[in-house]
């Protein structure tokens, strides 16, 4: 097995060849899109072969999140994965374009969620609903029309409930300012990224984006995989959230960046925020 909890210098297939079958709980990756003039987009990459290896190392009840294009998602389906849903990362700033560009300003990226057809029950997939909630919204209180408690009897279409003493009670649902997570993720792009988060990588993803995926779709102690470390954001998020990880990159510069982020993340302390904790 390769070294764990450290970004290592290998290509994707070399790392995957060293991993055992069904040894990974969650895969999150943002592979080269092969659509730009950036150096890492000039490599020859067989997505069908890559995703078949992902399917081999992923546990039957594990998630695979792909940050990429529709064409890449089709390759994932062709390799044997089943699509469950997708997130839209809605950016605060559009990607720049030239006068010859023949499409609108792009303000989003797609994040496809896949699972393995070998899974006997979809309900076995990890889904931490509370971890996906957002806080700081307006509080509210609404009357529950169908609430029942043990030993109590309903009346008036369920709006009032008769307790054991024969008194009618109204029951309410209270919300302390949270909203359930949805499929539109409004998170800053690199242009507006905090200076202490930004590293020297052209397509860096925000830590908040990875935190959502890791907290929502894995548990503490699980093992996460990313075969294209890039800016090292997955390695940092996994460390902060007490997940193990395997991660690699063929570029020595990005390997060093990732490991520096891991080292710094171990020194960060938690601070209280709405509904839980965030890292300072």
Predicted regions: what is each one?
Residues 3-7:
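Extreme N-terminal starter segment of soluble prokaryotic enzymes
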Residues 10, 58, 66-69, 187, ...:
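Short His-Asn-centered micro-motif
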Residues 15, 71-76, 237, 257:
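Phosphate- and divalent-cation-binding pockets in alpha/beta enzyme and binding domains
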Residues 19-21, 26-28, 38, 84-280:
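Class I S-adenosyl-L-methionine
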Residues 31-49, 185:
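Mobile active-site "lid"/loop adjacent to the S-adenosyl-L-methionine
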Residues 31-32, 68-71, 228:
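Short strand-turn motif at the edge of the Rossmann-like AdoMet-binding core
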Residues 43-94, 114:
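Conserved Class I SAM-dependent methyltransferase catalytic core
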